[in-house]
Amino acid sequence: ATVVAAGSHSLQIAKELGYGEDMSLLPVAGSFFIADDQLLNGKVYTLQMKKLPFAAVHGDAEVHDDSITRFGPTAKVVPGLERGRLSSVPDFFDVFGFTPEAFLSYANIMADRILLPFVLENLLYDLPVIGRKQFLPHVQKVVPSVELEDIERATGYGGIRPQIVDTANKSLDMGEAKIVGDDIIFNITPSPGASTCLKNAMRDTHTLLESLEGDYEFDEDAFREATIGHFPRADADDDTIAVDAVESAAADD
C-alpha cells in the first residue's frame, strides 16, 4: 500500500501509472507581503469570492516570530510545478498533456469573466515598485491603518498550489483532489496546511488499513493526542476546538 503525497508532482506520478487521465493542473504561485510589526494575534480573512478556488487574502502573525505580520497569498498562474525551479516547467507540460481536452479546458477557464481579471491582476503583485502599491488595498481590508511604507514583499515565503483542472467537464475544481487506485492513493491538495494535512493523514490511514486486510491497527486516539492535542484552545476544558480544526479539513491554510 502506498500514499503519494508529492504536492504538484502527485498528478504527474499518477499519470505515469495510468491514473488521472481526465485531470490536468493549473499551478498557482502564492506570494506574501509582510509588516515588521505585531498587527494581529490571529488569522483574519477577507471575503472569499465563491467562484475563485484560491484562498482569500488574509493576515496573520508569523508562526516563528509574532512581531512580524504577513498578508497574502497572491495567486499568480505559472507554467511550473515548483516555485523558482525552471527544471519543473517540463514536468508541468507532462501533466498538461497537450490534448484537445486540455487546451479547451484552459481556454474555458481563462475566458471566465471573474477568473481572467483576477489572474491578470495577480500578475502585477510580484512586480517591483507597483506590486506593493497594487496589493495595499487588500492589506487595508484586514488592517485599515497600514500604509504603503509599512509593508514589503516577503522573501522565502509561498509555493505552488496545484489547482485541479477537470478536462472532462472543462472546469476548474474548487477543492482538493484524491485519486484512490489499487492499493495506492495520490493526494493532490492545493493547500496541505496544518489542518488539512492531519485530516488527510487520518483518512488515508483508514483507507490503507482496509487494503492491508486487518494486519495492522491505527490508534486514532493516540494520533489525535500527539497532534491536535497540542493545539492551543480558548478553553482548556473544551476539547472540541482542536478536533474541529482537523475535522473541517479547512481551506484556511
Language-model region placement:
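Long, low-complexity, intrinsically disordered segments
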Residues: 247-253
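Flavin-dependent oxidoreductases
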Residues: 1-91
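Mid-to-C-terminal Rossmann-like scaffold of FAD/NAD(P)H-dependent oxidoreductases
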Residues: 56, 114-115, 248
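C-terminal catalytic lobe of FAD-dependent flavoproteins
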Residues: 95-218
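Residues that form generic nucleotide/phosphate-binding pockets
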Residues: 16, 138, 142, 226
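Short, charged low-complexity intrinsically disordered segments located at boundaries
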Residues: 40-44, 64, 165-174, 232-242
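Active-site-proximal substrate-binding core of FAD-dependent oxidoreductases
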Residues: 212-242
